[in-house]
Amino acid sequence: MAGHSKWANIKHRKGAQDALKAKIFNKFSKEIMVAVAKGGSDPNSNPALRLIISKARAKSMPKSNIEKAIAKGEGSTSNGENFKEIIYSGTLSHGISVIVVILTDNINRAIASLQALFRRANGQIGKQNSIPYLFEQKGYLEIEKNNLDEDDLMLFSLDNGAEDFQSDETNYMIYCQPRKISELKNEIEKKFSPNFRAVEISYFPNEWVELDQENTEKILNQIDNFLDDEDIQNVYHNLKFA
């Protein structure tokens, strides 16, 4: 069941590697603090925290950074409680649809920045917390191939709740219902002890838009501008890379 990774078309980030990692780790730290404030600091009894830690580890976030974020959420709950997640849909030029996930301690600032970003991109902001029909939420696991047998992993994944299994030259991609992701990840980890490159609950488009190279680069630059905003956690889109 080899196929092309959809994931590469959905999430896009830029910049020098060190700066990029620092930005990603900062976003994970905020998510960890919020999860601790809502459900406590024990990953065994807090599935939201357990999933975020899995995501952070998949992106090589140092253990010390994770522990520091947990301590901040635990020792200063006002920090975690003041962060709010809001989701906006919208469109960019050439009919590109986006979902923007915001995690902020200042909603007015975040919305004002988002409106400005859409204006600069000649786009149109949509409704808050309204997911367009073009997108579907799914759990996503990406695993390095290494010496893992594809058939063994595929059959095991499908038997444990996966809905789709794909592969490219270096990775296996597994899709499932969002509520299944923690259980599926844990079962795969116990059986195979693989190297996870991604553990996500994400938004996947049902329809793609493909542009020429020049306009693709323009859209990707606009998405980069969104991701540079301190309050924006993720941007999901339906632009298919040429």
Curated annotation (Swiss-Prot):
GO terms for molecular function: DNA binding. Keywords: Cytoplasm, DNA-binding, Transcription, Transcription regulation. The keyword DNA repair does not apply. One of its GO terms (cellular component) is cytosol. GO terms for biological process: regulation of DNA-templated transcription. Coiled coil: none annotated. PANTHER family: TRANSCRIPTIONAL REGULATORY PROTEIN YEBC-RELATED, TRANSLATIONAL ACTIVATOR OF CYTOCHROME C OXIDASE 1. SUPFAM superfamilies: YebC-like. It is found in: Cytoplasm. InterPro entries: Integrase-like_N (IPR017856), TACO1_YebC-like_2nd/3rd_dom (IPR048300), TACO1_YebC_N (IPR049083), Transcrip_reg_TACO1-like (IPR002876), Transcrip_reg_TACO1-like_dom3 (IPR026564), YebC-like (IPR029072). This is Probable transcriptional regulatory protein MHJ_0471. Transmembrane segments: none annotated. Pfam families: TACO1_YebC_N, Transcrip_reg. Belongs to the TACO1 family. The lineage of its organism: Bacteria, Bacillati, Mycoplasmatota, Mycoplasmoidales, Metamycoplasmataceae.
